[in-house]
Amino acid sequence: MAEYSLRSGAVICERVEDTVALGSRLGEQLRAGDVVVLSGPLGAGKTVLAKGIAVAMDVDGPVISPTYVLARVHLPRRLGTPAMIHVDVYRLLDHRDADLVGELDSLDLDTDLAEAVVVMEWGAGLAECLAARHLDIRLERVRYSDVRIATWQWVCSRDRP
């Protein structure tokens, strides 16, 4: 797979392995404090992309959708590298006024958000609570196909205090 700029880009992923590889390429460039928002319809490959990010970050644990627990912490295998906090806010979609930071704090995560990479599924409109900027990755399914179209760009929040 070609080199990708973390700044912005687009790619066609024809197979699941391509989506994992894209996540890995982008994940190699992420740093502690970064927030990544994964958007797209159900079954678009958000969790698959998160698996690729986890591979690049070399974190522990299987990456599965944290829909029912809201967040999972994947600790780093190497000292001096960030953990990955995998968040799925699908359950909060009907509660747009939900205090996401408060919800995450209530989980008593063992990792400080500023010292980890936060990968958030369904986080559009909520990521601004966590960071002044975030990497927005959008996955679209091609109808009647396994093909996905991925686009990404950094987004700055002007409304964040």
From Swiss-Prot:
GO biological process: tRNA threonylcarbamoyladenosine modification
Binding site for Mg(2+): T47, E121
One Pfam family of this chain: TsaE
Cellular localization per UniProt: Cytoplasm
Domain of life: Bacteria
Binding site for ATP: G43, A44, G45, K46, T47, V48
Main location: cytoplasm
GO cellular component labels: cytoplasm
One MF term in the entry's GO annotations: metal ion binding
SUPFAM superfamilies with a match to the protein in the record: P-loop containing nucleoside triphosphate hydrolases
Key words of the record: ATP-binding, Cytoplasm, Magnesium, Metal-binding, Nucleotide-binding, tRNA processing
Similarity section: Belongs to the TsaE family.
PANTHER family tied to this protein: TRNA THREONYLCARBAMOYLADENOSINE BIOSYNTHESIS PROTEIN TSAE
Protein function: Required for the formation of a threonylcarbamoyl group on adenosine at position 37 (t(6)A37) in tRNAs that read codons beginning with adenine. Is involved in the transfer of the threonylcarbamoyl moiety of threonylcarbamoyl-AMP (TC-AMP) to the N6 group of A37, together with TsaD and TsaB. TsaE seems to play an indirect role in the t(6)A biosynthesis pathway, possibly in regulating the core enzymatic function of TsaD.
Protein name: tRNA threonylcarbamoyladenosine biosynthesis protein TsaE
Taxon lineage: Bacteria, Bacillati, Actinomycetota, Actinomycetes, Mycobacteriales
